[in-house]
Amino acid sequence: MTNIRKTHPLIKIINHSFIDLPAPSNISAWWNFGSLLGICLIIQILTGLFLAMHYTSDTMTAFSSVTHICRDVNYGWLIRYMHANGASMFFICLFLHVGRGLYYGSYTYFETWNIGVILLFAVMATAFMGYVLPWGQMSFWGATVITNLLSAIPYIGTTLVEWIWGGFSVDKATLTRFFAFHFILPFIITALVMVHLLFLHETGSNNPSGLISDSDKIPFHPYYTIKDILGILLLILVLMILVLFSPDLLGDPDNYTPANPLNTPPHIKPEWYFLFAYAILRSIPNKLGGVLALVLSILILMLFPILHMSKQRSMMFRPLSQCMFWILVADLFTLTWIGGQPVEYPFIIIGQLASILYFMIILLIMPAISLFENKLLKW
């Protein structure tokens, strides 16, 4: 009898994707983040579904409904904090996953890479809209500030913002539509993930050396299933430590105050995972310029396949590029720190320098270093 795993039309697809998939024999723990992101997405969809059963998307009752979830629903506090901190874990895994792609030259699979960048945008949009839902002070003012950025678009800006708001300010209509979008987007993300995997399995995985590994492949199961399970257990451990010991560590205290359009918080700032982009936005004194820099700070990832000048794919054997990569990482940490600081003397100039350095490293310095390393290869 033929194995059902290899003949059944549906199970066959799963088999080719997760069981009999030929994988390089030398992929390190940096390749675990894809599966971790999948687990994060599942956690977010499940916890989000249970939250949606008790949440009301109305300005009068949204804040109270979140309080009700935390106080009266069985393990509601656990579901709520798993969802909030699950988003942080999602972004940590995302940043590490993208960083791995940059370091090892995975962006040369450009369909997979571009779908990945679109996924990053979709997850960021979902997270932003989710942050608005509890209808605390930071939810309301964050929504006001970020949606207002669209008014910088010439000619149609103001009309566009009012159309998104569903009125002349962030109000009931805005909250309702944000809830609708926040609910539907994760399912769109799931579909995009399948496309992402489809393109990845056309080429097969990259590996740390950046060399073609066709001559040395091993089956995904049991080798990488076991490895992924270890990663998943560690992810859940870190998430549960965060949820059970310090659930509000990454949140903003202002969001425990119900939204009040008449009272602006002293420092409006987004969640930690948006701070680097927020710092780039604030570093340009012009509104339209800031918005363009904000969008380009993420969109620039799509340029990496074009900007790749090296004869080698991975940075494994390129110490100068490695050095520049870690300077870029340090620069992103600096931007994240600046994004959370008030707009005053030392922070403004540090933010501007870090923003200039960010774009310079990617657009000029790294391609130049790659060309120099090519020269070094000619003995």
Curated annotation (Swiss-Prot):
One of its GO terms (cellular component) is respiratory chain complex III. GO terms for biological process: mitochondrial electron transport, ubiquinol to cytochrome c. Keywords: Electron transport, Heme, Iron, Membrane, Metal-binding, Mitochondrion, Mitochondrion inner membrane, Respiratory chain, Transmembrane, Transmembrane helix, Transport, Ubiquinone. Binds 2 heme b groups non-covalently. It comes from the Eukaryota. Heme b b566 binds at H97, H196. The keyword Ribosomal protein does not apply. It is a multi-pass membrane protein. The chain crosses the membrane at residues 33-53, 77-98, 113-133, 178-198, 226-246, 288-308, 320-340, 347-367. One of its GO terms (molecular function) is ubiquinol-cytochrome-c reductase activity. Heme b b562 binds at H83, H182. PANTHER family: CYTOCHROME B (PTHR19271:SF16). Component of the ubiquinol-cytochrome c reductase complex (complex III or cytochrome b-c1 complex) that is part of the mitochondrial respiratory chain. The b-c1 complex mediates electron transfer from ubiquinol to cytochrome c. Contributes to the generation of a proton gradient across the mitochondrial membrane that is then used for ATP synthesis. The cytochrome bc1 complex contains 11 subunits: 3 respiratory subunits (MT-CYB, CYC1 and UQCRFS1), 2 core proteins (UQCRC1 and UQCRC2) and 6 low-molecular weight proteins (UQCRH/QCR6, UQCRB/QCR7, UQCRQ/QCR8, UQCR10/QCR9, UQCR11/QCR10 and a cleavage product of UQCRFS1). This cytochrome bc1 complex then forms a dimer. This is Cytochrome b. It comes from Neotamias ruficaudus (Red-tailed chipmunk). The gene is MT-CYB.
